[in-house]
């Protein structure tokens, strides 16, 4: 995350202490989008926390369930094509922040941005980094 900042990027979330991110595994374990969001909201209330909730959706059925449920502030479109992202942004219609994630590269970044999303996650920044071979020599 530090290298992203140094390179001019921004981090919209540092950890689970500043925003709840409900991923696909959480959704599956909870028994669906509505159950996962509701449990996260109940947890926040019980702990006296005022945290934003982001829900990851994998398809249009999950997107519709999230929209029907509400209670979150951001929707992450996971592995949506550019065309599907554009359609999803139209369906969301500004009611929630929208993040695109999954399979986005520096070559496709502009196309996703032009869909009108608020945030774009580019995993290649962290999982496909080319290392630089450096060494230091001690001099007496």
What are these regions (language model features)?
Residues 16-17, 24, 49-51, 94-95, ...:
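Short coil/turn connectors at secondary-structure junctions
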Residues 12, 18-23, 53-55, 75-77, ...:
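Hydrophobic faces of well-ordered beta-strands that scaffold small-molecule active sites
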Residues 5-14, 39-46, 52, 58-73, ...:
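Alpha/beta enzyme core
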Residues 124-140:
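Short, charged, intrinsically disordered terminal tails
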Residues 60-71, 80-93, 104-122:
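Catalytic cores of alpha/beta
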Residues 43-54, 72, 88-103:
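Short beta-strand/loop segments at the ligand-binding rim of alpha/beta enzyme cores
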């Amino acid at each position: 995350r530090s290298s992203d900042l140094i390179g001019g990027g921004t981090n919209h979330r540092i950890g689970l202490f500043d925003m709840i991110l409900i991923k696909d595994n959480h959704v599956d374990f909870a028994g669906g989008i509505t159950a996962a969001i509701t449990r996260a909201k109940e947890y926040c209330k019980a702990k006296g926390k005022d945290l934003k909730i982001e829900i990851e959706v994998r398809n249009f059925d999950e997107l519709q369930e999230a929209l029907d449920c509400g209670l979150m502030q951001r929707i992450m479109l996971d592995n949506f094509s550019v065309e599907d992202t554009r359609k999803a942004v139209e369906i969301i219609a500004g009611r929630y922040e929208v993040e695109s994630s999954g399979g986005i590269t520096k070559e496709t970044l502009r196309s996703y941005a032009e869909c009108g999303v608020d945030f774009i996650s580019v995993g290649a920044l962290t999982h496909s980094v080319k290392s630089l071979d450096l060494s230091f020599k001690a001099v007496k």
